[in-house]
Amino acid sequence: MSMIVRSLIVACAICGMDLAICPAAEAQTQDHTRGFSIARVQYDGGGDWYSDPSSLPNLMAFLTEHTTIVMAKEPARVHIDDEDLFSHPYLYLTGHGNVRLSEPQVDRLRHYLDAGGFLHADDNYGMDESFRREMKRVYPSKDFVELPADHGLFNCHFEFAHGLPKIHEHDGQRPQALALFEEDRIVVLYTFEADLGDGWEDAHIHNDPEPSRLAALQMGTNIVVWALTH
């Protein structure tokens, strides 16, 4: 996806314009994803890429209610090898286990990110080692940088004075928002030791306190807004 086409898709979504009347955007958008859709990455390696199934529908519903972004009816699902990868400006990856990319997938993901795409990876406890390994293959010369609490991502829509919130108290480590940059643009955001996806899930699944669920949804909103406007 070129930066121009990505910008058209984003502008149509944020301004409330139907993608059907934005020809360049429509050409890059499947019929079932009219409006902005978060695309879940289906990856190889044995990890449960499909975990937290109610998380993205709930986050997208929250975005519809609390932003002016025109949202699709449901999230998408994409494999790095899929022809329509470049029609999705925003990828989401999560799971508890091993993440593995083939060499062609490494090259293709790098091309996607360099062309203006964005990847949000949410640590669901168990994928950390393999995800960091694969990102080092994608960008051998880049290292994750922790975003400070005063970074604009934490106040672009909702205010998070202390940075990334801790949603699921799995092992007591502090949450970190880690980023890979291409110049000044975040191309990969890795939310580590936070487990935002658990907070996006239906309330009865993890029994997270309501303030934690709200914080997770608000943080997810900030990430989407930041990715689409930067």
Which residues does each predicted region cover?
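An acidic, glycine-rich "communication" segment
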Residues: G46, S54, D128-H204, S212-L217, ...
